[in-house]
């Protein structure tokens, strides 16, 4: 299928490219784009794919008065998972209200917020290389070591949706800028914040073409209208360079560039 990434990606940057649709569990030597929410696509990406609609599902495998065992397809959107958890009084997915994307992408980056992350209630993932148990996956902060396609995952959740945590997590992201963006550019370094470091080197609000390091939160890149890949990439590398020169800290990408 043909996807126009200027319309499909959250940052609204990119051209039209052929994307392979994976309708069944299989090997794929390339990159799965998911919802393209934390993605910056170059003018010449290699081998890109997307899961078929058959992997957009939520299935209850088992439940009792204490917990529920779910299988969720990796094309399922975070907003759908959040709504299901809230409507069914399930604890553990409250933070998904503020993290856009599909389950596959959430797992790939071990997405989370304020100490919560997607791997916490995980049982296993179905990959192109078979089913892999959570205890055999060395997740870390915004990191999953598995370099293969994901198709579905299973979770065990307790009952008791936490409304107080839900509100607190929503407020935690109230300072995020609006507009076309791929979310955070960089992961936060240990004991510090990427946004603070970028602001400290004078780049908050700095623009190149229609790409801008947000004047509300410096670790967000905003596409003001028609930003190019080159404009966005320039700002990312400029911020990395300036922070390293000033603080000796090498910022690590949270955005995926392909």
Swiss-Prot record:
GO cellular component: cytosol
Source species of the chain: Campylobacter jejuni (strain RM1221)
Active site (UniProt): 142, 184, 254
Matches recorded under Gene3D superfamilies: 3.30.465.10, UDP-N-acetylenolpyruvoylglucosamine reductase, C-terminal domain (3.90.78.10)
Family to which this protein belongs: Belongs to the MurB family.
Function: Cell wall formation.
Known cofactor(s): FAD
Compartments where found: Cytoplasm
Protein's recorded name: UDP-N-acetylenolpyruvoylglucosamine reductase
